[in-house]
Amino acid sequence: MFKKILIANRGEIACRVIKTCKELGIATVSVYSDADSRSLHVTMADQAINIGPAPSSTSYLVIDKIIRACKKTGADAVHPGYGFLSENAAFVNKLEREGIKFIGPPSEPIRVMGDKIESKIFAEKSGVNIIPGHQAIIKDSKEAIEIAKKIGFPVMVKASAGGGGKGMRIAKAESEVEDAFNSSVNEAKSSFGDDRIFIEKFIEKPRHIEIQILADNYGNVIHLGERECSIQRRNQKIIEESPSSFIDSSLRNEMGEQAKRLASTINYTSAGTVEFIVDQNKNFYFLEMNTRLQVEHPVTELVTGVDLVEEMIKIAAGEELKLKQEDIKFNGWSIESRIYAEDPERNFMPSTGRLRRYIVPDNINSIRNDTGVYEGGEISIYYDPMISKLCSYGKDRNEALNTMEMALNNHYIDGIRNNIDFLTAIIRNKKFISGDINTGFIDEEYQDGFKANIIDKQFSLLFSIAATYFFTLDQFRSRNQNDRSLIFEKSLVAEVEKEIFKFKTYDKNDNLIIEFNGEVITIDSNYELGNPIASLMINGKDYSFKVERIISGYKLSGYGFSSNIKIYSSRAFELSKHMIEKNYALNDKIIRCPMPGLVISIDVVVGQEVSAGDKLCTIEAMKMENVIRSESSGTIKKIFCNDGDSLASDQTILEFS
C-alpha cells in the first residue's frame, strides 16, 4: 500500500480524497496555487506545496510542477481527482517514467476514451450501441452545415476532446449550425486546447444515464448501477440521483454489461463511468467514457456502501477486487444537488466573492455535504464555481427528495449569488417529482428563465405570515417594552410581490397571536432575531425560511422562492398608495461586465435598436461563454470595448441612449 499520496487537484474533490486517505492511514500532500493558499484542501492535508500563480495553466495543469512536488515530498502515488490532469495520458506516462503511481487507468484507455471519435469506434467494436453521426473531424462551418443536413436535424455539434458540457451546442435548423460550430470551436480551444469538432444526431428528449464501473489488473470488472444525470444546464449536470426511476433491473443489467464489455476491450482498470443517452423507448446509446472519478460519485457510494476512492487506491496498489458483481446491492435512494456560485436569474452567470456566511445543514440526518470551502473563504474567478455537493439519502425516492428539500431550505450562503433557490424549485417541481424528466427539462420548465420572486399563493401567504411574525418580534425587541400588549395589538399589512395580506396581531396568555381573515394562525418557534435561518411551526407544520432584514421589511427565501416582503402599519399602507416608487432599472442605461472575463464578441452596433432578451455580447468567464442580453428595449448609444478585450468586474461594456 502507498505511504503518501499527492492529490493533484483542489477544492471539494481534493478534500474528499484526503478523507479516505486518512481512514486508510495514508499521508497526504496537497498542491495549491497562489489563489488557493488559504483553501480548505491545503489545511486538511499533512503537507502542502505551492505550485505557482492562480491561472490553472500555470499551476494545476503544469505536469512538471506536480512531479516536482511529488519528489520534494516523497509522494509515491498521485490521485488526480476530476478535471485538470485527471484524463491526461501524457501526465500518466510521465509519472510512470518517474516511478510514481497514477491512481487511475493506464494512459492508453485514457487516450482512446478521451477522443470522442475514436472512443465511438472502440465502443462499436465492443458491441456497444452508438449514436448515428459523422465520426470524423469537421474542418469548417461550411462543411458542418452540409454534414448536418445529411444527418438530419436536430444535430449535436461537439468537441472531440474534453467534457463537462463545454464545446457542445445543439443546432435545430440549418440557420443555427454556423453559430453552434463557431461557439463549440472557441469553447473547446479555450477549455481543452483542442478545437476538433464532430457532429452526431441529437436524440430528442433523451435521458442522460451513466454506469459506474470498477476494474482491477486481474481482469475483474463490475458495475455499480446507474446514475440519473438528466437535470442539466448548459449541458452540465446539476442534480443527479441513484438509482434512476426510469431504469428497471433488466435495462440496468443490459447497460451494465455493455459498460463492462467496453472496459474489458480497452484493458481498463480503476473506477470509470460509461455514459449513455436513453430515449423515451428505453433505447440507449454510448455517449462517452469518463476515465476518472465522477463529480457525482457520492450518490453511488450512498446506495451501494462502496467507497470508490478507496477502491481506486487499492486497485492502483495492485490489489485484486474483493467485490464480485453479485456482492453489489442497491439499498435506498440518493440525490445530489450541486451548489454553484452562479446566478440562475441571469442565465447562470458565474459569481465570485467572499463567503460572508456559510451555514451547512449538518444537523439533518441522512445528509452528506462534500465541500472545499468555508465561511470567510473566497470563490475565485480562476476555477469552477462549485461550492459544494449536497447529497441526501432515503429508503426510497420520496424520502430522499423530502430530505433534500429540507437540507436546501436550511443551507445558507451570503456574500455571493448561488443556485440554492433554483435547485429547491426543481426538487419541488411536479414533473421532477413524478420522474418525468429529460436533458431538456430546465429549458422546458423554465422557458423564460428562473425567477425566484414568482411565488404561488400558498407560499405568498406563508411568507407574509413569517415576515409579520419577525416584524412583531423585532418591534418588541427594539422598543424594549414590558407591556407586550402595547406592541402586539396591531393591524399590519404585508405586501408580497404586489399581493396584499392584512393581519391582526396581539398577545394572548403571553403568546403572539396572528389573525388572518378572522382565523387564528398558531406559530411556535424558538427563533432568535439575527439568525439567518428561522424554523417556524405554522398551524402545526414545520417550515424553514432564510431571513434578511431590509429597510421596508424582510427578504425571505425558501422552497424555491425568494422575495422582499414589505410590512406596513394600516396607516402607513394607506399612505404608501400615494407614493411613486422609483424604478431604478429604467434609469440604469449602462451595461457592465458582471465579473472579470474576455470579450468573445460584441453583437450590436451603435445606433442599433434592441428589444428585451436580445443578445448584446458574449463574455468568457470560468472557461464558459456567457451571453449577456438586454433587459429592456432601447438604442445602443456607445460601445466601450472590442472583441478580445479583457474586462474587469463592473467595467462598462456599452451604454443605451
Where are these regions (language model features)?
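Short amphipathic alpha-helical segments
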Residues: K166, P243, D384-L390, N587-K589
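Catalytic cores of soluble metabolic enzymes centered on carboxylation/carboxyl-transfer
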Residues: A259, P298-T300, T304-T522, Y527, ...
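Catalytic P-loop NTP-binding/switch module of NTPases
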Residues: S552-C593
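Short acidic-glycine loop/turn motifs at beta-strand connectors
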Residues: A173, A215-N220, D279-K282, D362-N363, ...
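Flexible glycine-/small-residue-rich
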Residues: G104, A159-A161, K172, I213-A215, ...
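N-terminal beta-alpha lobe that positions the nucleotide/phosphoryl donor
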Residues: M1-V274, V278-Q294
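Structured functional modules or segments
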Residues: N583-S657
